Amino acid sequence: MLVTLEGLDGSGKTTVWESLRASHDDGVTFTAEPTDSQYGQAVRRSESAADADPIAELFLFTADHADHLSRVVSPALDRGDVVISDRYSDSRYAYQGATLADTVPRAMEYVRGIHQPWTRPPDVTLYFDVDPDTGAARSGATNKFETAAFLADVRANYEQLIDYTPERFVRIDATQSPEAVIADAEAALADALPDDAWA
């Protein structure tokens, strides 16, 4: 089963991912995007460049995702592992959809169309919901993807994705304390996963 953690920068999802990884290691593969591969490193360089071309950046993200799927996610699923990924395809749709909003019409649909041949849909997505101002303040707005105005557009895209497949998403209030958010995530996974897969 493929579980993804999604949310705005500053939502605390990586803190949750780290907590889950520290307490669940038997039969669970923990991974993240961007990856540590050469493709993921190229993504990180692009993220920090204010003048990066948004179309080129989309294809960097897509290449990293395709490599991640073939090298990590699919083999782990084939072994019968639960895979928990800190960011996955929905991040691409929400973030690159916002980045390209002034470049191509129906930007999020454009991104999904490019990305979907190279992905495998998640089974469960925990969405850590936080308002854009809080997300920007927590993250420190260290790059172009972390300003409150940009995150507002990203959040609107996430809401649209939730409307598309509401049965896949579990919304978690990320304005709570880290301990409460982690507890909610643990409870959501206990509900979503078979007993023998999550103990």
Swiss-Prot record:
One of its GO terms (molecular function) is ATP binding. Its EC number is 2.7.4.9. GO terms for cellular component: cytoplasm. It catalyses: dTMP + ATP = dTDP + ADP. It holds the Pfam family Thymidylate_kin. Disulfide bonds: none annotated. ATP binds at residues 7-14. The keyword Kinase applies. Gene3D superfamilies: P-loop containing nucleotide triphosphate hydrolases. GO terms for biological process: dTDP biosynthetic process; dTTP biosynthetic process; dUDP biosynthetic process. Keywords: ATP-binding, Kinase, Nucleotide biosynthesis, Nucleotide-binding, Transferase. It comes from the Archaea. Belongs to the thymidylate kinase family. This is Probable thymidylate kinase. It comes from Halobacterium salinarum (strain ATCC 700922 / JCM 11081 / NRC-1) (Halobacterium halobium). The lineage of its organism: Archaea, Methanobacteriati, Methanobacteriota, Stenosarchaea group, Halobacteria. The gene is tmk.
